[in-house]
Curated annotation (Swiss-Prot):
Residues 4-193 form the Glutamine amidotransferase type-1 domain. The gene is guaA. It comes from Flavobacterium johnsoniae (strain ATCC 17061 / DSM 2064 / JCM 8514 / BCRC 14874 / CCUG 350202 / NBRC 14942 / NCIMB 11054 / UW101) (Cytophaga johnsonae). Catalyzes the synthesis of GMP from XMP. PROSITE patterns: GATASE_TYPE_1, GMPS_ATP_PPASE. ATP binds at residues 221-227. Keywords: ATP-binding, Glutamine amidotransferase, GMP biosynthesis, Ligase, Nucleotide-binding, Purine biosynthesis. SUPFAM superfamilies: Adenine nucleotide alpha hydrolases-like, Class I glutamine amidotransferase-like, GMP synthetase C-terminal dimerisation domain. Its EC number is 6.3.5.2. It is an enzyme of class 6 (ligase). It comes from the Bacteria. This is GMP synthase [glutamine-hydrolyzing]. One of its GO terms (cellular component) is cytosol.
């Protein structure tokens, strides 16, 4: 994957979005913290400086060393990057009279500029800054303005350096992707050769060379990431890949056997381990959400360790790590504060001494799905909604019992099958049911009931970082609510969660 684009991260919430837009142009890019610029820049064809919550005037402002970049390769500075270049090149940056946040329009665009080829007149852009450039460096030329921002875009004479005070990566910037394409393809001449087919060919060759005849073990979850990783590894090393699919007793209804059969039908060397009783036994009496997660993580490691020891001469542990996980681990400020323990289980015992292989570590989730399609994986598997590693345990509020698991599996099954039959499943990013720790009074026939309450949750999102609740049709909600109450013994009330993230999280625990 040569001819990369290097994106320097200054802590902006939009940095990953820049990378996604660049990847959409079939151009490979990588994100690095501004203070960890690679020493060898020979494989990079262009550099993008991202935005930042900091002010260039602040004492704690990021100050990257751009001596190996400025004037030596094409450079695009976005928002904070544009202000940084202006500030340290002799221009003036000052606090704006009002915070410039939201939509704006380019009222002036300099004619004949390649950067703005194909960009519509009065094009809408997205602003997000509290400082503004008041004067350009003497060697800079204004390229664009808005009503409130005179220097919305500029370039440095004698360099292939461009700077913009808005965010082209945000969807609200209607021609933003076109501007990125103009800079990367027409100005920087970066090849557009990063495609799913190219990735598969290159990664399979890399895995063959790295792994040789070594044996590799991989824990399958039934999710998209581990499934695509397994098929990719299987294509490279065949039966030297040993897959372990553990049933923790907290999967969806009939999921363990159904997914196991699918894996075997795909030709994977997979072993199913039904450890449901062991997990539920360890979870008995535990109500605290974090303790549940850690207990499930610990027991999974124990089960995986037991099964791995039955294999001889395994040297590698494969994981379905994807790029957002990698970026988070080396971010400007380090990993975010722990809101919840991460679903992905790590921390295998040191004595296992396995080397790690992560074939998907440079891909975003949507790219993983496209690679999966290229590999011929069943669209039903690729289109599965995200499902938490701890399974239904964090959708059962309070302690966990086999009876509660059974109820929630049945409710979830009615909900998910209903979404599919109404043609709604693929329009929803994630959906599921939550068993609440309360009973409610009801009437069935002439009998008074006092039974469980369940909540239904359906959200739309692109990456899970933010999410909006889905406005499911009232007729559907009425039908699925009636079906749940009539078909699932022990439930007499259904509610629908209309909270967005933030402030709520997608899962209740």
């Amino acid at each position: 994957m040569q001819h990369n684009v290097l994106i320097l991260d200054f802590g902006s919430q939009y940095t990953q979005l820049i990378a996604r837009r660049v990847r959409e142009l079939n151009i490979f890019c990588e994100i690095f913290p501004y203070n960890h610029i690679p020493s060898d820049l020979s494989s990079y064809k262009a550099v993008i400086l991202g935005g930042s919550p900091f002010s260039v005037r602040g004492e704690d402002a990021p100050h990257p060393d751009l001596s190996q970049i400025r004037g030596k390769m094409p450079l695009l500075a976005v928002c904070y990057g544009a202000q940084y270049l202006a500030h340290f090149s002799g221009g003036e940056v000052a606090a704006s009279n009002t915070r410039e946040y939201g939509r704006a329009n380019l009222s002036y665009i300099k004619e004949g500029e390649t950067f703005f080829e194909g960009v519509s007149e009065n094009s809408q852009v997205w602003m997000s800054h509290s400082d503004s450039i008041k004067a350009l460096p003497t060697n800079a030329v204004k390229l664009a303005s808005t009503h409130d921002v005179e220097y919305a875009a500029y370039k440095i004479e004698g360099e292939t350096t461009y700077a913009i005070q808005y965010h082209p990566e945000v969807y609200h910037s209607t021609d933003g992707k076109k501007m990125l394409e103009n800079f990367l393809v027409k100005i920087a001449e970066v090849p557009q050769n990063f495609t799913p087919n190219a990735f598969v060919d290159e990664m399979v060759a890399e895995l063959k060379e790295k792994l040789g005849n070594d044996k590799v073990v991989l824990g399958l979850s039934g999710g998209v990431d581990s499934t695509v990783a397994a098929v990719l590894l299987n294509k490279a090393i065949g039966q030297n890949l040993y897959c372990i699919f553990v049933n923790n007793g907290l999967l969806r209804k009939n999921e363990f056997q159904n997914v196991l059969d699918q894996y075997k039908g795909m030709g994977l060397n997979v072993k199913g381990v039904d450890a449901g009783d062991r997990f539920l036994g360890e979870l008995a009496g535990i109500s605290d959400p974090e303790t549940k997660r850690k207990t499930i993580g610990r027991v999974f490691i124990e089960v995986f360790d037991d099964e791995s020891h039955l294999l001889e001469d395994v040297k590698w542990l494969a994981q379905g790590t994807i790029y957002p996980d990698v970026i988070e681990s080396v971010s400007v400020k380090g990993p975010s504060a722990t809101i919840k323990s991460h679903h992905n289980v790590g921390g295998l015992p040191d004595y296992m001494k396995l080397k790690i292989v992560e074939p998907l570590r440079m891909l975003f989730k949507d790219e993983v799905r496209r690679v999966g399609a290229t590999l011929g994986i069943d669209p039903e598997l690729l289109g599965r909604h995200p499902f938490p590693g701890p399974g239904l345990s964090i959708r059962i509020l309070g302690d966990i019992t086999p009876e509660k698991v059974q109820i929630l599996q049945d409710v979830d099954s009615v909900f998910i099958e209903g979404l599919k039959s109404w043609g709604l499943y693929d329009k929803v990013w994630q959906a599921g049911a939550i068993l609440l720790p309360v009973n409610s009074v009801g009437v069935m026939g002439d009998e008074r009931t006092y039974e469980k309450v369940v909540a239904l949750r359906a959200v739309e999102s692109t990456d899970g970082m933010t999410a909006d609740w889905v406005h499911l049709p009232y007729d559907f909600l009425m039908k699925v609510s009636n079906d749940i109450i009539n078909k699932v013994k022990g439930v007499n009330r259904v509610v629908y969660d209309i909270s967005s993230k933030p402030p709520a999280t997608i899962e209740w625990e």
